[in-house]
A protein has these predicted regions:
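All-alpha prenyltransferase/terpene-synthase fold signal
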Residues: 1-324
Length: 324
């Protein structure tokens, strides 16, 4: 079996070797840029680790695994444009380095390339793989639309938020694990268990991302801390701050949400202080731990020897202990 670090090296080498030699250069250069500025490569790593539970040659599925990474980066490229984000992984976003039209068109091309790479799998697996990938892509779009809709609502519930992040984030991690299992000839039951495992891990991962947006280190995080607060994003933390706040705290939160002109650093500091007083930081940490613990029962039920699961378990544990 390969270690997660060995798998990551395979993925990075494969991505670096992708020949973006079509023209015009102005279309493909942003794609090369997006895929070269780092990233944790979580989705292709999970796909190869899922495959490696059942088979010992994960390099066979590098093309579809990197298709998922290309798709993921396509979504980030368009998300950054919609969010007016200046930085991604500590580097200028595509629409800042080039322009909005380039971000749209290069992103569209990344989506097409993602399908090309994912389709590079055994022909007998193609229908199941493409059905899984297409359904996942549709769900991610639905999640993004919910996220945008929430910007105009003040009554978003915790349940609605969890469903939104399941669609926007969790399903792609779940897809990666299930696709790896399908390509490794795993049983349908084991493939479905890995999907459910990925869903729970994805929920924990996104909640952790929300947490780090407030409490992370911007030097490690690769983008400005407090961006969700500045934009009044309906996160698990903001929703529950309103739910748990007393009358005075709720009024102060509402004051910062309603302000049209403000100093961003002052707003982030004030809202973070309220989170701390209300206990939202601890509440979020407990919710993250809950989903991580729930995930383990699905992985435990996968019918392979425990020693074959060790690397996947260790990798996911490292994901949950990240600081960025």
């Amino acid at each position: 079996m390969r270690s997660a670090d060995q798998i990551l090296s395979l993925i990075n080498a494969y991505i670096d070797s992708l020949p973006y030699n079509r023209k015009p250069v102005s279309l493909y250069e942003p794609i090369r840029y997006v895929l070269s500025i780092g990233g944790k490569r979580i989705r292709p790593t999970l796909m190869l680790l899922g495959y490696n539970l059942f088979q010992d040659d994960p390099e066979r599925i590098l093309a579809p695994a990197c298709g998922l990474e290309t798709y993921h980066n396509y979504t980030l490229l368009h998300d950054d444009l919609m969010d007016h984000a200046d930085l991604r992984r500590g580097q200028p976003t595509v629409h800042k380095r080039w322009n909005a039209n380039t971000a749209i068109l290069s992103g569209d091309s990344m989506l097409v390339l993602a399908y090309r790479y994912v389709a590079q799998c055994p022909v007998e697996k193609l229908p199941a793989v493409m059905q899984l990938f297409t359904e996942t892509a549709l769900e991610i779009g639905e999640g993004q639309q919910y996220d945008m809709d929430f910007e105009h609502r003040n009554d978003v519930t915790e349940e609605e938020y969890i469903e939104m992040i399941r669609l926007k984030t969790s399903v792609l991690l779940a897809c990666a694990l299930k696709m790896g299992a399908l390509l490794a000839d795993a049983s349908p039951a084991d493939a479905d268990l890995l999907y459910k495992f990925g869903e729970q891990i994805g929920l924990a991962f996104q909640l952790q991302d929300d947490f780090l947006d407030v409490y992370g280190d911007s030097r490690l995080f690769g983008k400005s801390i407090g961006g969700d607060i500045v934009c009044n994003k309906k996160t698990y933390m903001l929703i529950n701050a309103f739910n748990r706040a007393d009358e005075a705290q709720r009024a102060e939160l509402a004051h910062w949400i309603e302000l049209k002109t403000f100093d961003p650093a002052e707003k982030v500091a004030a809202v973070t202080h309220l989170y701390n007083i209300i206990g939202i930081d601890k509440m979020a940490e407990e919710k993250i731990a809950h989903y991580f613990e729930c995930s383990q029962k699905y992985l435990d039920a996968v019918s392979v020897a425990p020693e074959r699961k060790a690397e996947l378990m260790a990798y996911v544990a490292r994901m949950m202990n990240r600081k960025y």
